């Protein structure tokens, strides 16, 4: 199958030939050193934002709200270049997904993020994991000593899910040694590192609705 055919089938292999890591050929992201705090808005809200140079864009939202960035990468790269920074897209890796789908979503997160970096976008790596067996590949392609982003949303509802989150978090600290962690959601007291906390998107959305109501 030709690259043109792969492009038509939506695999985006034509975006570039990037350095890769691990047995699954995950594109490698370059480290980013983010010293100043950035106000982050979710991708679907960013589409309507006029003051784009004041914000960063995150993807801690449902996949269907940002799949368009995968299906039309050049168009949305031009759009995202207008913001201060962008997080790598958080394609879902749910535990009930087949392992092949989990790895594919990790790969396309990096394929798109590496492309964004190649066109001059400041990309903060979003770190995610599934179960303990995902540790063998879920950190592939992530830079060492970089600012990174994580989200604890949905991981603190049971002892088991909280324990798994902490195990993955500690594995992240050990493997990629992030210099700063942009953290969305509740921060468990056990989490170490240089953490910059941000409220999850649903809390900021609630505040936005309340503010809009007051203005009426």
What are these regions (language model features)?
Residues 53-55:
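Active-site gating/metal-coordination segments in enzymes
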Residues 18-46, 60-63:
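Aromatic- and Gly/Pro-rich donor/ligand-binding loops
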Residues 44-51, 62, 69-213:
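Eukaryote-skewed repeat-based solenoidal scaffolds used as protein-protein interaction platforms
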Residues 1-32, 193-216:
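C-terminal accessory extensions appended to soluble enzyme cores
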